[in-house]
Amino acid sequence: MNSFPIPVVLLGPGSQAEDETLDYIHMPQGMSVYTPPVLPEPEQIACLTQAQSVLRAILDALDRADPKQPNPRIELWALDEENRQLLKQVLGEGEVSARIEGEYQVYIQEAVFAGVWRVVSTCPDATTDYIEVGAAPEVLRGAARYGANQWSLDVGRVPDGVMNAPSILAEIDDQLLSWHPGKPVHVVNLTLLPMSPQDITFLDETLGAASVTILSRGYGNCRISSTAVPYCWRVVYFNSQDTTILNTVEITDLPEVACAAPEDLRDSHERLTEVLKWVGSI
């Protein structure tokens, strides 16, 4: 009798040739966390009383911050260079920064203490420099609202290759008609929709661009841009390879990702208290 050969077949993951390799989008690998500022020895900064006074004023503003009231503001115009440098060292740079373009320019940087914002505006005849404490600087909300100049969406002629953008624009226009401050945000998630490059281009051209650009570096990177339509924002998230992972339109007064939450302000109060104890100001 002849032996009948039984072929050996390898089984299990990796034993068989794959028809195609899945190319997964990499999600952000890191998350921005609070890092205490590196401070000089207390005796080295004992004479810098102006900066210490500003830090105590910020702590007081954090203690009484109320979203229903105007944000407390601390002016910095009287500080000399040494005191400014100490203040800059203590505040550091947090997750969110913003820029407002127009007749005058405004630069905004959140401190490592969330909800503490440094606001510098420049115009031909004056410069302002102050700290503002709150969810977001009021000038940011105002510029986005008053910088808009397109109160209705006119789709007009639809170019070739554009399929789904007109229906998205109709949804946005409908939401804008009924939206008012205090109403919950309405999000259009373009990532989940069959949007071609031509659709995205047509959408952005129709919404237009306005004066506010915000960058948030919390979990990955997020770019927020105001449009020419009031209360309408483009919000795009990127991973560490600069690949888009979420692309949205938001109808709101200011996207939540750009704002400090109430618990952030409470955490900042605790952290700044520890810093001031080290400095010897409290």
UniProtKB/Swiss-Prot annotation:
**Keywords from the UniProt entry:** Plasmid
List the InterPro entries hit by this protein, alphabetically.
HupH_C_sf, HupH_Hydgase_express_prot_C
Which domain of life does this protein belong to?
Bacteria
Pfam families in alphabetical order: HupH_C
Give the family from UniProt: Belongs to the HupH/HyaF family.
What name is this protein filed under? Answer: Hydrogenase expression/formation protein HoxQ
